[in-house]
Protein backbone atom coordinates (compact mmCIF):
# COMPACT_ATOMS: atom_id res chain seq x y z
CA UNK A 1 0.00 0.00 0.00
CA UNK A 2 1.34 3.46 -0.85
CA UNK A 3 1.53 5.82 2.08
CA UNK A 4 1.53 9.53 1.43
CA UNK A 5 4.75 11.04 2.72
CA UNK A 6 5.63 14.68 3.20
CA UNK A 7 5.96 16.87 0.13
CA UNK A 8 4.09 14.45 -2.11
CA UNK A 9 6.56 11.55 -1.86
CA UNK A 10 5.23 8.01 -1.63
CA UNK A 11 6.75 5.05 0.08
CA UNK A 12 5.72 1.47 -0.61
CA UNK A 13 5.34 0.39 3.01
CA UNK A 14 3.02 0.84 5.92
CA UNK A 15 3.53 4.00 7.98
CA UNK A 16 4.98 3.52 11.44
CA UNK A 17 2.38 4.08 14.13
CA UNK A 18 2.99 6.41 17.07
CA UNK A 19 0.73 6.75 20.10
CA UNK A 20 0.62 10.31 21.48
CA UNK A 21 -0.54 10.42 25.13
CA UNK A 22 -1.22 13.74 26.88
CA UNK A 23 -4.20 15.20 28.72
CA UNK A 24 -3.72 18.51 26.87
CA UNK A 25 -5.67 18.17 23.61
CA UNK A 26 -3.76 21.03 21.95
CA UNK A 27 -0.44 19.30 22.59
CA UNK A 28 -1.78 15.99 21.28
CA UNK A 29 -3.07 17.75 18.16
CA UNK A 30 0.14 19.69 17.46
CA UNK A 31 2.40 16.66 17.96
CA UNK A 32 0.10 14.47 15.86
CA UNK A 33 0.15 16.99 13.01
CA UNK A 34 3.95 17.23 13.18
CA UNK A 35 4.27 13.44 13.05
CA UNK A 36 1.74 13.11 10.22
CA UNK A 37 3.73 15.66 8.20
CA UNK A 38 6.76 13.41 8.66
CA UNK A 39 4.80 10.43 7.32
CA UNK A 40 3.83 8.68 10.55
CA UNK A 41 0.39 7.41 11.48
CA UNK A 42 -0.77 8.63 14.89
CA UNK A 43 -3.12 7.41 17.57
CA UNK A 44 -4.26 9.66 20.41
CA UNK A 45 -4.93 9.04 24.10
CA UNK A 46 -5.65 11.56 26.82
CA UNK A 47 -4.62 9.57 29.91
CA UNK A 48 -2.72 6.43 30.85
CA UNK A 49 -5.81 4.18 31.01
CA UNK A 50 -6.84 5.12 27.49
CA UNK A 51 -3.25 4.53 26.31
CA UNK A 52 -3.18 1.01 27.79
CA UNK A 53 -6.57 0.24 26.19
CA UNK A 54 -5.24 1.32 22.79
CA UNK A 55 -2.10 -0.79 23.30
CA UNK A 56 -4.29 -3.88 23.79
CA UNK A 57 -5.95 -3.33 20.38
CA UNK A 58 -3.29 -1.72 18.18
CA UNK A 59 0.23 -2.49 17.02
CA UNK A 60 2.18 0.63 17.95
CA UNK A 61 5.81 1.34 17.06
CA UNK A 62 6.53 4.13 19.58
CA UNK A 63 4.79 6.01 22.40
CA UNK A 64 5.15 9.69 23.33
CA UNK A 65 3.96 9.86 26.93
CA UNK A 66 3.18 12.75 29.27
CA UNK A 67 3.70 12.21 33.00
CA UNK A 68 1.02 14.34 34.71
CA UNK A 69 -2.40 13.05 33.62
CA UNK A 70 -5.72 12.16 35.26
CA UNK A 71 -6.92 8.61 36.02
CA UNK A 72 -3.56 6.92 35.43
CA UNK A 73 -0.41 9.03 35.24
CA UNK A 74 2.33 8.43 32.71
CA UNK A 75 4.76 6.70 35.07
CA UNK A 76 2.11 4.23 36.26
CA UNK A 77 1.11 3.55 32.66
CA UNK A 78 4.78 3.04 31.78
CA UNK A 79 5.22 0.44 34.54
CA UNK A 80 2.15 -1.49 33.33
CA UNK A 81 3.31 -1.25 29.73
CA UNK A 82 6.78 -2.58 30.56
CA UNK A 83 5.22 -5.73 32.01
CA UNK A 84 4.26 -6.72 28.45
CA UNK A 85 6.19 -4.70 25.89
CA UNK A 86 9.55 -3.25 24.81
CA UNK A 87 8.02 -0.64 22.49
CA UNK A 88 10.08 2.57 22.69
CA UNK A 89 8.60 5.13 25.07
CA UNK A 90 9.66 8.76 25.06
CA UNK A 91 8.44 10.77 28.02
CA UNK A 92 7.46 14.30 27.03
CA UNK A 93 6.88 16.27 30.22
CA UNK A 94 6.87 19.68 31.86
CA UNK A 95 8.45 18.03 34.91
CA UNK A 96 12.05 19.17 34.53
CA UNK A 97 13.73 18.19 37.80
CA UNK A 98 16.62 15.76 37.47
CA UNK A 99 14.83 13.38 39.86
CA UNK A 100 11.81 13.31 37.51
CA UNK A 101 14.01 12.37 34.56
CA UNK A 102 15.84 9.70 36.58
CA UNK A 103 12.52 8.21 37.75
CA UNK A 104 11.14 8.04 34.22
CA UNK A 105 14.26 6.45 32.77
CA UNK A 106 14.61 4.05 35.71
CA UNK A 107 11.02 2.86 35.24
CA UNK A 108 11.72 1.98 31.62
CA UNK A 109 11.38 5.07 29.45
CA UNK A 110 13.80 5.13 26.54
CA UNK A 111 14.13 8.91 26.52
CA UNK A 112 12.91 12.02 28.33
CA UNK A 113 12.16 15.30 26.57
CA UNK A 114 11.21 18.45 28.45
CA UNK A 115 8.28 20.67 27.48
CA UNK A 116 8.28 23.00 25.75
CA UNK A 117 9.90 20.73 23.18
CA UNK A 118 11.84 21.61 20.05
CA UNK A 119 9.98 20.05 17.07
CA UNK A 120 13.17 19.23 15.13
CA UNK A 121 14.71 17.54 18.18
CA UNK A 122 11.50 15.60 18.85
CA UNK A 123 11.42 14.27 15.28
CA UNK A 124 15.14 13.41 15.38
CA UNK A 125 14.70 11.44 18.61
CA UNK A 126 11.59 9.67 17.31
CA UNK A 127 13.49 8.60 14.18
CA UNK A 128 16.48 7.42 16.23
CA UNK A 129 14.34 5.32 18.59
CA UNK A 130 12.36 3.83 15.71
CA UNK A 131 15.62 2.86 13.97
CA UNK A 132 16.85 1.11 17.12
CA UNK A 133 13.49 -0.59 17.62
CA UNK A 134 13.52 -1.93 14.02
CA UNK A 135 17.02 -3.36 14.54
CA UNK A 136 16.01 -4.93 17.86
CA UNK A 137 12.78 -6.35 16.36
CA UNK A 138 14.72 -7.88 13.46
CA UNK A 139 17.21 -9.45 15.87
CA UNK A 140 14.38 -10.89 17.97
CA UNK A 141 12.75 -12.34 14.84
CA UNK A 142 16.07 -13.96 13.83
CA UNK A 143 16.40 -15.57 17.29
CA UNK A 144 13.02 -17.25 16.82
CA UNK A 145 13.97 -18.83 13.50
CA UNK A 146 14.86 -22.49 13.25
CA UNK A 147 18.66 -22.79 13.76
CA UNK A 148 18.96 -24.84 10.54
CA UNK A 149 17.27 -22.05 8.61
CA UNK A 150 19.73 -19.48 9.98
CA UNK A 151 22.84 -21.61 9.27
CA UNK A 152 21.71 -22.86 5.85
CA UNK A 153 20.00 -19.66 4.74
CA UNK A 154 16.69 -21.46 4.48
CA UNK A 155 18.04 -24.12 2.07
Residue locations for each model-derived region?
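Short, Lys/Arg-enriched segments at the junction into DNA-binding effector domains
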Residues: 16-17, 128-155
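Active-site residues of response regulator receiver
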Residues: 22, 66, 93
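Two-component/phosphorelay signaling modules centered on CheY-like receiver
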Residues: 25-43, 57
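Conserved phosphotransfer cores of two-component systems
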Residues: 56-58, 80-87, 107
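Receiver (REC) domain active-site loop signature in two-component systems and cognate sites
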Residues: 69
Amino acid sequence: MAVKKKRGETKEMEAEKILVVDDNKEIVYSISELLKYEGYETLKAYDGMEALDIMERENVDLILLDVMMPRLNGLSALMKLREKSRIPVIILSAKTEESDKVSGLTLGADDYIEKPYNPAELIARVKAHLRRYRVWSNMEAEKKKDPDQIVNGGL
